[in-house]
């Protein structure tokens, strides 16, 4: 417990907030190149094969990014746009690939939540 004199001399130091997406350098999105595309199993109560990509961003950071939706066309050397946003049951995956931009195609025939998956508007009859 500091004395009043110590507080007058030094004051209180503000706690710094930690940046969860430091690799993005305060940018909303960053472009990167896929180094490897693979699957990973989630944490305990869940069971699946989640698709992830190891991406080297334009600022030379290597990250793991989740590929959302069913099916994808990503390969090694594909160029993707990455946004922040973690995957709760995959430790160490703190980014999402954006569908429908650069080399990662949107999901065809998707009707709901189209904007999140880069899907075209369905033709009305």
UniProtKB/Swiss-Prot annotation:
<comment type="function">
    <text>Protein S12 is involved in the translation initiation step.</text>
</comment>
<dbReference type="GO" id="GO:0005840">
    <property type="term" value="C:ribosome"/>
</dbReference>
<dbReference type="InterPro" id="IPR006032">
    <property type="entry name" value="Ribosomal_uS12"/>
</dbReference>
<dbReference type="InterPro" id="IPR005679">
    <property type="entry name" value="Ribosomal_uS12_bac"/>
</dbReference>
<keyword id="KW-0496">Mitochondrion</keyword>
<keyword id="KW-0689">Ribosomal protein</keyword>
<dbReference type="GO" id="GO:0015935">
    <property type="term" value="C:small ribosomal subunit"/>
</dbReference>
<feature type="compositionally biased region" description="Basic and acidic residues">
    <location>
        <begin position="10"/>
        <end position="23"/>
    </location>
</feature>
<dbReference type="Pfam" id="PF00164">
    <property type="entry name" value="Ribosom_S12_S23"/>
</dbReference>
<comment type="similarity">
    <text>Belongs to the universal ribosomal protein uS12 family.</text>
</comment>
<dbReference type="InterPro" id="IPR012340">
    <property type="entry name" value="NA-bd_OB-fold"/>
</dbReference>
<feature type="region of interest" description="Disordered">
    <location>
        <begin position="1"/>
        <end position="27"/>
    </location>
</feature>
<dbReference type="GO" id="GO:0005739">
    <property type="term" value="C:mitochondrion"/>
</dbReference>
<dbReference type="GO" id="GO:0006412">
    <property type="term" value="P:translation"/>
</dbReference>
<keyword id="KW-0687">Ribonucleoprotein</keyword>
<protein>
    <recommendedName>
        <fullName>Small ribosomal subunit protein uS12m</fullName>
    </recommendedName>
</protein>
<dbReference type="GO" id="GO:0003735">
    <property type="term" value="F:structural constituent of ribosome"/>
</dbReference>
């Amino acid at each position: 417990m500091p004395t009043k004199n110590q507080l007058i001399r030094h004051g209180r130091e503000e706690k710094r907030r930690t940046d969860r997406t430091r690799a993005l350098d305060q940018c909303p999105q960053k472009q990167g190149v896929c180094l490897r595309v693979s699957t990973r199993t989630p944490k305990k109560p869940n069971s699946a094969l989640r698709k992830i990509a190891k991406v080297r961003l334009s600022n030379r950071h290597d990250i793991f990014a989740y590929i959302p939706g069913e099916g994808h066309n990503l390969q090694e050397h594909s160029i993707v746009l990455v946004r922040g946003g973690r995957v709760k049951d995959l430790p160490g995956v703190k980014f999402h690939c954006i569908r429908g931009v650069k080399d990662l195609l949107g999901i065809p025939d998707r009707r709901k939540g189209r904007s999140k998956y880069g899907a075209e508007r369905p033709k009305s009859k």
